[in-house]
Swiss-Prot record:
GO terms for cellular component: viral capsid. GO terms for molecular function: structural molecule activity. It comes from Pyramimonas orientalis virus (PoV01). This is Major capsid protein. It is found in: Virion. Gene3D superfamilies: Adenovirus Type 2 Hexon, domain 4, Major capsid protein Vp54. Pfam families: Capsid_N, Capsid_NCLDV. The keyword Protease does not apply.
């Protein structure tokens, strides 16, 4: 008897729990047929001239039935000499961006949030490519001999709920009476280009439209919809203190905070506090923990990536030994506390309803009071679309 057959007949009572009354096979593929659809990325133009420090609005045209991903494409002329395009310039370019339906703001994101979300969720396979998309590196580029400038184009993906999940694509076909707008405030030239007085060569939004087949299109237009969406809450820069009041609402899946010294830009985060704890109505949510718990353990448990910065250094004195190249890693300064098992997924896996908490405070012991602290909360809400209009089921 061959070894494979011997394994096959070595079947006992315990195997009943694994392969008794089987429900699937690994040796016959099963697939499901999907509805007919197509996608197309179409450029949208701003009302107003897009430039550093400006606020512009982009009405989303009704080219298709649903909208999914949105990218900001921006081109700048970068100086080869210093100062030049700064690191993470793509994130810094978007000071804030919000989506508006029928005049109601549904969600708003910020430059720091775009950076934080990338640091926590970007996969290893996409990391280097994403850095090129948003200029997440200070590496020099190959230019023509004698040239003093080089044109650079950045592609910055927006991270609204409908951009990250095709099942939450925004149904324009069901919003006949409400206009969808993207309101964008550009960052300062000094933050993005390293010098004031520069200007954008061009900027536009590219929206991925989804076209549905006749039957599904009719169904989307006629019936009402309820979407469980994610929103970002941010109460503004707080002066660093031992007690920071958290004025948040709705079921929150995670809290994220960063500490910034004066003059720090996007992606430049400080850590001066010795320990932190969260209090809800005067009760400790967890015992006091050190920064390493929030910057390493929590991201490791709940996110795709643990934000760290690693630098390779060469020790010239031991160049012929294995210790010649040393890697030094530090935490990224991004603090996380998750109420959910898997906060990156749309499927709810744990929340804390902050609407039912009268007094929530984040206690930071030993924090430098000259710094500022930004605290973000990711919450669930319900977007209702009916009778050609859309709005939130629960307001603040």
């Amino acid at each position: 008897m061959g070894g494979g057959l011997m394994q096959l007949v070595a079947y006992g009572a315990q195997d009943i729990y694994l392969s008794g009354n089987p429900q699937i096979t690994f040796f016959k593929v099963v697939y499901r047929r999907h509805t007919n659809f197509s996608m197309e990325s179409i450029e949208q133009t701003f009302n107003g001239f897009p430039n550093f420090g400006k606020k512009v609005t982009c009405p989303i045209s009704r080219n298709g039935d649903l909208i999914h991903r949105i990218y900001l494409q921006a081109t700048v002329t970068d100086s080869i000499a210093s100062p030049g395009l700064t690191k993470w310039a793509g994130h810094k370019l978007i000071k804030s961006v919000e989506v508006e339906i029928g005049g109601q703001r549904i969600d708003k994101h910020y430059a720091d949030w775009l950076h934080i979300w990338n640091e926590l969720t970007q996969t290893a396979g996409h990391w280097d490519g994403y850095k090129l998309m948003v200029n997440g590196t200070t590496a020099s580029q190959t230019v023509a001999p004698g040239a003093t400038t080089v044109s650079k184009t950045m592609f910055i993906p927006l991270q609204f709920w409908f951009c990250r999940n095709p099942g939450l694509a925004l149904p324009l076909i069901a919003l006949q009476y409400h206009e969808v707008k993207i309101n964008l405030e550009f960052g300062d030239s000094a933050d993005v280009m390293g010098a004031s007085g520069a200007s954008l060569d061009s900027a536009a939004l590219y929206v991925d439209y989804i076209y549905l087949d006749t039957d599904e299109r009719r169904r989307f237009a006629q019936v009402s919809h309820e979407y469980l969406i994610e929103q970002l809450q941010f109460t503004g820069d707080e002066s660093a203190s031992s007690k920071i009041k958290l004025n948040f609402n709705h079921p929150v899946k995670e809290l994220i905070w960063v500490e910034k010294a004066s003059g720090d830009g996007v992606g430049e985060y400080d850590t001066t506090y010795d320990s932190a704890k969260l209090q809800l109505n005067g009760h400790e949510r967890f015992t006091q923990r050190t920064p390493q718990y929030f910057q390493l353990v929590q991201p490791y448990q709940h996110h795709e990536r643990v934000p760290t910065t690693c630098v390779l250094t060469v020790d010239a004195s031991s160049i012929e030994t294995d210790e010649a190249v040393m890697e030094t890693c530090t935490t990224g300064g991004i603090n996380v506390y998750s109420f959910a098992l898997k906060p990156e997924e749309h499927q709810p896996s744990g929340t804390c309803n902050m609407s039912r908490i009268d007094n929530a405070t984040l206690n930071l012991q030993g924090v430098d009071t000259d710094n500022t602290v930004k605290v973000f909360a990711v919450n669930y809400n319900v977007l209702r679309v009916m009778s050609g209009m859309g709005g939130l089921a629960y307001s603040n």
